[in-house]
């Protein structure tokens, strides 16, 4: 490794770093790429070799800001990840494989999706891990100064992305396994050993609420006491659910750009929202909150509803809006036997919420399940294949509702009118009736195909059967 001459102040910091880490590290034998190391909740700066005269500065939370030649800047923050020679094998396997195994459990969306989709939207790059010594590696994230400069982001949000969590009841087992590894127990495959530990311990129990968390293999080295102990909000991006904690929500949202579809869900007890382990990824649509394990801890499981939905046409396109009304009616017809024969914990309700240019067609349910969402998607897919004759019964049912709206409209002397506009004038319920009559199987097929082109997303979790709002479409 290249030798770097460091100031006395930096060497003093590194001696403190070495002491806290419990390893003997020569401060002059550190890789060029290492910049900030966090140990026991404290940040230790390691001077970065100046290249091309670039200026650097360190913010209060340890983020290093590098000023570029063009006047711009880039921010970097490094997290230390320590315990056992197994990390050398992790490094060789590459960050993608490591994050995949560390963050994937029961179908949780893979790290590739996290790094390529979510982090890109936030303007964040995760660099290849750097081996600090034989038993520690450092992950560096790089992004915008305004993003990484926020203490809430640096201390909590990025840790929740980079480090898997163990529930309290599994901490003892984790420590036992790590202790075995620290004694340099000979193993044929260290990486397989890591996978085994993660699959046996990660995300089990109830990783929620007012409980302490221990990042995998961290055991205090990254100041577990400062990790979050309660969930505040859920951020959904397409088919990935990223769980934030009690941080500055608006600050995080501001760091996410363009087309991210943000769905927020708040529970009445302690601001608790769904944990990462209760989501599953897989084929791209399979995102669902397994509500029972979550609800039992905080609220009455029989009165809390979870709603997930597909993006659908809004009200600005009359033809597609009418087709969406028929599709929603067909889905409702499909679940009506369940509505009629099941008791409260399995109650389902299909909804279509239409706004100006976008809408939601989804399913609200008590005790939502992964299988339920798959069945809902399958029903939606089948509707896209219906013939004109088969579609007729669903059009008739949609017309019954539309005619009911017409009668209400007439009874109030046309003061209740539909709110969307295609020609500059408000559209009346009579025009919606005409549009439903004109819906064709081809139009339904086209709308369904577009809906299935984007994954389902959690849009509501709370006391009411269904209350998704425009906030879910931001």
Curated annotation (Swiss-Prot):
It is a peripheral membrane protein. Its main location: mitochondrion. It comes from the Eukaryota. GO terms for molecular function: metal ion binding. It is found in: Mitochondrion inner membrane. Residues 1-42 form a transit peptide. Keywords: Electron transport, Membrane, Mitochondrion, Mitochondrion inner membrane, Respiratory chain, Transit peptide, Transport. One of its GO terms (cellular component) is mitochondrial inner membrane. Component of the ubiquinol-cytochrome c oxidoreductase, a multisubunit transmembrane complex that is part of the mitochondrial electron transport chain which drives oxidative phosphorylation. Belongs to the peptidase M16 family. UQCRC2/QCR2 subfamily. Component of the ubiquinol-cytochrome c oxidoreductase (cytochrome b-c1 complex, complex III, CIII), a multisubunit enzyme composed of 3 respiratory subunits cytochrome b, cytochrome c1 and Rieske protein, 2 core protein subunits, and additional low-molecular weight protein subunits. The complex exists as an obligatory dimer and forms supercomplexes (SCs) in the inner mitochondrial membrane with cytochrome c oxidase (complex IV, CIV). This is Ubiquinol-cytochrome-c reductase complex core protein 2, mitochondrial. It comes from Euglena gracilis.
């Amino acid at each position: 490794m290249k030798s770097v001459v460091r100031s006395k102040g930096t060497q003093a910091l590194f001696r403190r770093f070495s002491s806290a880490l419990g390893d003997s590290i020569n401060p002059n034998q550190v890789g060029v790429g290492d910049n900030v190391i966090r140990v026991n909740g404290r940040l230790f700066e390691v001077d970065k070799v100046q290249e091309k005269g670039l200026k650097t500065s360190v913010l209060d939370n340890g983020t290093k800001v590098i000023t570029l030649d063009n006047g711009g800047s880039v921010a970097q923050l490094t997290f230390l990840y320590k315990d056992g020679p197994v990390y050398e094998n992790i490094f060789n396997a590459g960050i993608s494989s490591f994050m995949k195994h560390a963050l994937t459990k029961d179908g949780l969306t893979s790290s590739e999706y996290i790094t390529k989709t979510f982090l890109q939207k936030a303007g964040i790059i995760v660099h290849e891990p750097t081996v600090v010594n034989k038993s520690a590696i450092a992950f560096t994230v790089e992004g915008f100064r305004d993003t990484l400069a926020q203490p809430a982001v640096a201390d909590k949000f990025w840790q929740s992305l980079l480090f898997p969590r163990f529930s309290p009841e599994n901490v003892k087992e984790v420590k036992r396994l790590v202790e075995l590894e620290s004694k340099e127990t000979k193993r044929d495959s260290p990486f397989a050993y890591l996978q085994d530990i993660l699959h046996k311990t990660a995300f089990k129990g109830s990783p929620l609420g007012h409980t302490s968390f221990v990042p995998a293999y961290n055991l205090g080295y990254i100041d577990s006491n400062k990790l979050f102990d309660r969930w505040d909000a859920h951020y959904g991006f397409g088919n990935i659910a990223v769980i934030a904690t009690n941080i500055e929500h608006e600050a995080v949202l501001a760091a996410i750009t363009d087309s991210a579809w943000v769905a927020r869900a708040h529970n009445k007890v302690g601001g608790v929202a769904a944990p990462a382990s209760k989501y599953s990824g897989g084929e791209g649509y399979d995102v669902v909150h397994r509500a029972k394990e979550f609800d039992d801890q905080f609220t009455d499981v029989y009165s809390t509803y979870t709603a997930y939905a597909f993006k659908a046409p809004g009200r600005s396109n009359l033809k597609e809006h009418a087709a969406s009304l028929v599709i929603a009616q067909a889905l409702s017809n499909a679940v009506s036997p369940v509505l009629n024969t099941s008791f409260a914990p399995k109650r389902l309700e299909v909804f279509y919420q239409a706004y100006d240019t976008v809408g939601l067609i989804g399913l609200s349910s008590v005790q939502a399940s992964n299988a339920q969402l798959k069945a809902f998607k399958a029903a939606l897919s089948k509707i896209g294949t219906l013939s004109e004759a088969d579609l007729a019964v669903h059009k008739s049912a949609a017309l019954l509702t539309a005619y009911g709206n017409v009668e209400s409209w007439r009874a109030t002397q046309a003061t209740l009118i539909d709110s969307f506009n295609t020609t500059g004038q408000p559209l009346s319920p009579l025009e919606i009736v005409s549009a439903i009559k004109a819906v064709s199987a081809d139009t339904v097929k086209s709308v369904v195909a577009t809906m299935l082109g984007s994954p389902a997303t959690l849009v509501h979790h709370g006391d009411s059967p269904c209350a998704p709002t425009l906030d879910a479409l931001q």
